[in-house]
Amino acid sequence: MAFWLRSLGLHFRPHLGRRMESFLGGVLLILWLQVDWVKSQKIEQNSEALNIQEGKTATLTCNYTNYSPAYLQWYRQDPGRGPVFLLLIRENEKEKRKERLKVTFDTTLKQSLFHITASQPADSATYLCALD
């Protein structure tokens, strides 16, 4: 059985219909733009959709430029829901694991890899990386 994972830098769902979510989405967009402008930071994640065979390892890539972050975080976002924190890795750590998840952080390559081993259809979601 094959399924897909999405990896995006920023994902908004304006059709949710709740005023509070629209308001918060606008505030988050403004804050994100301010942080991006101040740090002149560019984050790139690999392909928008990734098709994975069940049981195989899924690997998502997050590349960044211009500065060295103190840490990098990965989040999972299911449709119609907010992002959920998964893992945080610090600049002095090369690798971090949690159950079937593994994150590597290479400050020389300015890259983080996010691996999901023994992939399952329930892993289908949007995955996001964030720097600080």
UniProtKB/Swiss-Prot annotation:
Q: Which UniProt keywords apply?
A: Adaptive immunity, Cell membrane, Disulfide bond, Glycoprotein, Immunity, Immunoglobulin domain, Membrane, Receptor, Signal, T cell receptor
Q: Which residues form the signal peptide?
A: 1-40
Against InterPro entries, the record matches this protein to:
Ig-like_dom, Ig-like_dom_sf, Ig-like_fold, Ig_V-set, TCR_variable_domain
For this chain, the annotated S-S bridges are 62-129
Q: SMART domains under this entry?
A: IGv
Q: Where is the Ig-like domain?
A: 41-132
The record's subcellular locations are: Cell membrane
Q: Would I find NADP among this entry's keywords?
A: no
Which one Pfam family would you cite for this protein?
V-set
Chief subcellular site? membrane
Q: Which domain of life is it from?
A: Eukaryota
Give me the Gene Ontology terms describing cellular component: T cell receptor complex
UniProt GO BP: adaptive immune response; response to bacterium
In this protein, the residues bearing a glycan are 63
Cited function: V region of the variable domain of T cell receptor (TR) alpha chain that participates in the antigen recognition. Alpha-beta T cell receptors are antigen specific receptors which are essential to the immune response and are present on the cell surface of T lymphocytes. Recognize peptide-major histocompatibility (MH) (pMH) complexes that are displayed by antigen presenting cells (APC), a prerequisite for efficient T cell adaptive immunity against pathogens.
Protein's UniProt name: T cell receptor alpha variable 6
Species this chain originates from: Homo sapiens
Source lineage: Eukaryota, Metazoa, Chordata, Craniata, Vertebrata
